[in-house]
């Protein structure tokens, strides 16, 4: 292996016709982010000095979606093959760097495999990622003489004898920038497809006396590409199965690994239990002994020790201290914070609000733009009226406050410690400490009331 720096080229110019979509193929999501983003992330983890993204179809949308300033955008106006794509990027290659070639629609390539490929590359030669298949039909074959790689022949151009070869080209390779630029300049399109094949550089390198080293990926799924939605769905299942296996081996109890989706990163403590059909998005941290019920969605959350999220609750950009309970059917929106032992029950929505230690909102309530103290009881149907149609206002509730059912708190308003709000009250003014507040229409009784009769 050379000691030179390394850059990466990601080919992402294809139309993806078989996806039957207006979305560029490489932007279709896998595990919650675009396919090509998985490849970009791998390149960054490798320590690439620069990442060149070769684009064509849907370039404007690609650039709008992939906002990493480290990307160097290279246009391939016509799709004339992989060799042609690399020719567009070649002017950006430094002579003394290694250039690693990856694909935007091969999303599961691992950093470990790429590190082995870089390590195996001979000084001045080429590192080539290959696999052996029981049925290699349709793939380029690795041609060897006396064990040494001398070329790659595409399936359509292969002889009957060459088609018996079961070692195939994955398309992933690494070579020196100076040599690669020269070989790319020598490519032609005299083949059955009429395209410029990057694979032809293998024969050119052999003719120059360069060594070609091969490496196999740890798993076949690492080099499987996506051309249609069926293949994308299959790779999604492969990815999720791998993530579930890692979590199980790390001590997380997934009650059904086949019905768990990780679409981000999960940091966890000990003795976690996750029921079926749970989705984890973004960055989620679970403390010790956390229990997640079936059908929950957690995105960018921190969940404290001994907390429980009951079924079908949705939490986003929220933070729970130890011993909290949420749900079932609760929604915590961005900015929701629950102090130790707080409880949020069914059909309660919290947004940009903090619920203090031991406080409870059990049923059918909306708490937005609020600061709620400790030991507070929020009755069913309580609403913080935080929006006047133009601006948001805050509700402040002190400690040990009792809020009766069907209460409306019209912000901005402050409720002091120990206050009691009777059921059905609309609060429009601040409430002092230990006050009882109620606002109701006087109850009227009409004896012998006759209900209206429906006209026939």
From Swiss-Prot:
Q: Which stretches of sequence are listed as region N-acetyltransferase?
A: 251-456
Q: Keywords for this entry?
A: Acyltransferase, Cell shape, Cell wall biogenesis/degradation, Cytoplasm, Magnesium, Metal-binding, Multifunctional enzyme, Nucleotidyltransferase, Peptidoglycan synthesis, Repeat, Transferase
Q: Where is this region: Pyrophosphorylase?
A: 1-229
Q: Which Pfam families match?
A: Hexapep, NTP_transf_3
Cystine pairings recorded for this chain: none
Q: Where in the cell is it found?
A: Cytoplasm
Q: What domain of life?
A: Bacteria
Region entry Linker, spans: 230-250
Q: How is the cofactor bound?
A: Binds 1 Mg(2+) ion per subunit.
Report the sequence similarity comment from the record: In the N-terminal section; belongs to the N-acetylglucosamine-1-phosphate uridyltransferase family. In the C-terminal section; belongs to the transferase hexapeptide repeat family.
| HAMAP family attached to this UniProt entry | GlmU (MF_01631)
Q: What is this protein called?
A: Bifunctional protein GlmU
Q: What organism does this protein naturally occur in?
A: Yersinia enterocolitica serotype O:8 / biotype 1B (strain NCTC 13174 / 8081)
